[in-house]
């Protein structure tokens, strides 16, 4: 029986060719007025998840994305 991939994980994460997990930077939904411009600028783009977080995400995408 094939395992299903979690749809929410498909939308939020990507895998690199080497198997690292990439996601968008967190903390940019609201409340940007309080933050410095450099902080907002640094939160653009994507980030590579750490080892423990990537292990959890990979459980939900058994065959990759």
Curated annotation (Swiss-Prot):
Top-level taxon of the source organism: Bacteria
Pfam families named in the record: Ribosomal_L35p
UniProt xrefs under InterPro entries: Ribosomal_bL35, Ribosomal_bL35-like, Ribosomal_bL35_CS, Ribosomal_bL35_sf
Gene3D superfamilies: 4.10.410.60
GO biological process: one example: translation
Keyword Ribosomal protein (UniProt): yes
Record keyword Ribosomal protein present: yes
Protein name: Large ribosomal subunit protein bL35
Family listed: Belongs to the bacterial ribosomal protein bL35 family.
MF annotations from Gene Ontology: structural constituent of ribosome
GO cellular component: cytosolic large ribosomal subunit
UniProt keyword terms in alphabetical order: Ribonucleoprotein, Ribosomal protein
UniProt organism field: Wolbachia sp. subsp. Brugia malayi (strain TRS)
């Amino acid at each position: 029986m094939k395992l299903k991939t979690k749809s929410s994980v498909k939308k939020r994460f990507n895998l690199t060719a080497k198997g690292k997990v990439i996601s968008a930077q967190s903390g940019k939904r609201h409340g940007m007025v309080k933050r410095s411009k450099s902080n907002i600028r640094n939160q653009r783009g994507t980030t590579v998840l750490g080892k423990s977080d990537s292990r959890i995400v990979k459980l939900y995408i058994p065959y990759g994305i």
